[in-house]
């Protein structure tokens, strides 16, 4: 490839609306061009990276036995109504009507369509297992698109869907996809971690997320440095304190705490650690034909509620936060002074494991400007229902008992789910087993954000000069930068010769024949992030040398023209 036959458009400054590093660098490198909110055109440089990513994904999916299909972006609404996701997905699901007033959606995922394929095409257990995958455009009508392609509305995704005859078969299919994802991210050349996760809106019984490690990542990744334990913040288990609850040593006392509506302020006034306080969080659930049920969740003062965990408490699946009016009726006071002792109306009390292990604690007295001190379970109030309700923090014990937990940041780029029979039962996707009995197919689904990979890779690999692509997904593996290409016959001839040699060897090479000044030429390719550069100049040619430099190298190395290919291959193999 020659630059004169390509399209290169770089910027010295990023647009004002570009917030994060990847967005700024992709815009400056001419990889993407904004069309509208959350909508981007992928320019030639960016598209080359996408094609590299797709190629690796496609190779590994095929190797794992998945079969490629291509499903429509526009899907009939009736399929989504069958599964109930028409109503559950909310405004992110773009719904519209055609000229005949029929409902359609712009797909964010394709569980409904692929399940429809399975129920019409698969009849017998002999046709199972099967795994369909596609690399296709998706659309989510994000309320606030931001961060460039990291949270756009239109994006490209690889989504796969496995169908098995039973749960044991699903475990095999799931492991195949987990292993394939591991190989994919290894081939991308990215530092990543697979973590246990919650299934969220897609549903199912088990899942893992694949995160690219980056300090700028939105997601907290919980892991144990001394073991293989890893989970996202939603799924990471906060184990119960190992020590038994201490005996009560203080009397229950109502204490005046004027204006202290926060645990931190109460602890400061009383001169006690924040860990001696308990925070009260009030939730509500709807009761058909009656008043909402009020719930009081209790956590240690320095801990934060994990809403996903709370939703798993029996009866709290569809909780909402209580209104101020509901709180006033149930407790007789406003938030900041609430507690489980002496409520006006009966409420359901649920304590986090750590809160349930506390003694002599401080909690709201259900009277403005007052808190109780010296509160103890069993003596001052009944023993509560106990669940894991909180986010873990660094230093917590690892659930596998092999050390303590640490936290890093990551960007989610892949997710694998065990769906089970949620969709197959809803859509009557069944098969006949060897006994002639009808059984629901057991499903898994597996997604990778193709375009999101670009942003995540940049967030992990950049410096002050620009992007540093891993060689496997770089737009070009090497760029030849001739100094004086338009002026020196010797430079032009050697650059053309080297270009031809590398092309013949299967190297993805760019020859910059634009005649740019060296500084501008080097700056463009450092910004774009090509992993290796070969400089051809008159001075070096007179000495029988070319300059070879990796994007992360501090200085160039002199290499004989005949040795460039071998040197490049050796570096690419590292």
From Swiss-Prot:
Disulfide bonds listed in the record: none
Enzyme class: ligase
Protein name as it appears in the record: Proline--tRNA ligase
Highest rank taxon of the organism: Bacteria
HAMAP family according to UniProt: Pro_tRNA_synth_type1 (MF_01569)
Signal peptide annotation: none
Catalytic activity: tRNA(Pro) + L-proline + ATP = L-prolyl-tRNA(Pro) + AMP + diphosphate
SUPFAM superfamilies: Class II aaRS ABD-related, Class II aaRS and biotin synthetases, YbaK/ProRS associated domain
Function, in words: Catalyzes the attachment of proline to tRNA(Pro) in a two-step reaction: proline is first activated by ATP to form Pro-AMP and then transferred to the acceptor end of tRNA(Pro). As ProRS can inadvertently accommodate and process non-cognate amino acids such as alanine and cysteine, to avoid such errors it has two additional distinct editing activities against alanine. One activity is designated as 'pretransfer' editing and involves the tRNA(Pro)-independent hydrolysis of activated Ala-AMP.
PANTHER family per the UniProt record, alphabetical: MITOCHONDRIAL RIBOSOME PROTEIN L39/PROLYL-TRNA LIGASE FAMILY MEMBER, PROLINE--TRNA LIGASE
Principal location listed in the UniProt entry: cytoplasm
BP terms from Gene Ontology: prolyl-tRNA aminoacylation
Family: Belongs to the class-II aminoacyl-tRNA synthetase family. ProS type 1 subfamily.
Places the protein is found: Cytoplasm
EC assignment: 6.1.1.15
Gene expressing this chain: proS
GO cellular component, one term: cytosol
Any one Pfam family match given in the protein's UniProt record, by short name: HGTP_anticodon
GO molecular function: aminoacyl-tRNA deacylase activity; ATP binding; proline-tRNA ligase activity
Domain notes: Consists of three domains: the N-terminal catalytic domain, the editing domain and the C-terminal anticodon-binding domain.
Record's subunit section: Homodimer.
Keywords: Aminoacyl-tRNA synthetase, ATP-binding, Cytoplasm, Ligase, Nucleotide-binding, Protein biosynthesis
């Amino acid at each position: 490839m020659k630059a004169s036959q390509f399209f290169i458009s770089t910027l010295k400054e990023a647009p004002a609306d570009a917030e994060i590093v990847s967005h700024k660098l992709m815009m400056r490198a001419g990889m993407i061009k904004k069309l509208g909110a959350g909508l981007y055109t992928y320019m030639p440089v960016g598209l080359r990276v996408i094609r590299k990513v797709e190629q690796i994904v496609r190779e590994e999916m095929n190797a794992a036995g998945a079969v490629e299909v291509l499903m429509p972006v526009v899907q009939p609404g009736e399929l989504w109504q069958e599964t109930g996701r028409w109503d559950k997905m909310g405004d992110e699901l773009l719904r519209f009507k055609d000229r005949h007033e029929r409902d359609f959606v712009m797909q964010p995922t394709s569980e409904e369509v692929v399940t429809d394929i399975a129920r019409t095409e698969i009849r017998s257990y002999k046709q199972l297992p099967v795994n369909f995958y596609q690399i296709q455009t998706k659309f989510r009508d994000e309320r606030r698109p931001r961060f460039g392609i990291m949270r756009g509305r239109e994006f490209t995704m690889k989504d796969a869907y496995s169908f098995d005859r039973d749960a044991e078969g699903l475990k095999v299919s799931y492991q195949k996809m987990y292993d394939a994802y591991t190989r994919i991210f290894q081939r991308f050349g990215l530092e990543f971690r697979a973590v246990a996760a919650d299934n969220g809106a897609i549903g199912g019984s088990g899942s893992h997320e694949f995160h690219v490690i980056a300090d700028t990542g939105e997601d907290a990744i919980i892991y144990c440095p001394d073991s293989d334990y890893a989970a996202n913040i939603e799924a990471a288990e906060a184990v119960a304190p190992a020590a038994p609850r201490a005996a009560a040593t203080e009397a229950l006392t109502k204490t005046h705490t004027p204006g202290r509506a926060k645990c931190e302020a109460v602890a400061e006034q009383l001169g006690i650690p924040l860990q001696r306080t308990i925070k009260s969080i009030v939730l509500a659930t709807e009761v058909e034909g009656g008043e909402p049920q009020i719930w009081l969740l209790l956590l240690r003062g320095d801990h934060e509620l994990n809403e996903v965990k709370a939703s798993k408490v029996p009866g709290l699946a569809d909780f909402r936060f209580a209104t101020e009016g509901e709180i006033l009726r149930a407790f007789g006071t406003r938030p900041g002074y609430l507690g489980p002792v002496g409520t006006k109306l009966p409420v359901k009390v649920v304590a986090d494991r750590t809160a349930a292990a506390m003694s002599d604690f401080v909690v709201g007295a259900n009277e403005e400007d007052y808190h109780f001190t010296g509160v103890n379970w069993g003596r001052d109030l009944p023993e509560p229902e106990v669940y894991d309700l909180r986010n873990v923090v660094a230093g917590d014990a690892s659930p596998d008992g092999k050390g303590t937990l640490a936290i890093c940041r990551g960007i989610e780029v892949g997710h694998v789910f065990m769906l089970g029979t949620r969709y197959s039962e809803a859509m009557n996707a069944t098969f006949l087993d060897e006994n002639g009995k009808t059984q629901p197919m057991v499903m898994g689904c597996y997604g990778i954000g193709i375009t999101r990979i670009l942003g995540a890779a940049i967030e992990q690999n950049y410096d002050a000069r620009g992007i540093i692509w891993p060689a496997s997904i770089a737009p070009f593996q090497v760029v030849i930068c001739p100094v004086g290409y338009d002026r020196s016959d010797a430079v032009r001839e050697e650059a053309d010769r080297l270009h031809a040699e590398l092309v013949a060897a299967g190297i993805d090479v760019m020859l910059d024949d634009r005649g740019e000044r060296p500084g501008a030429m080097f700056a463009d390719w450092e910004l774009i992030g090509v992993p290796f550069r070969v400089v051809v100049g008159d001075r070096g040619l007179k000495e029988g040398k070319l300059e070879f430099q990796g994007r992360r190298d501090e200085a160039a190395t002199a290499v004989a023209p005949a040795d460039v290919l071998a040197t490049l291959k050796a570096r690419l193999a590292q």
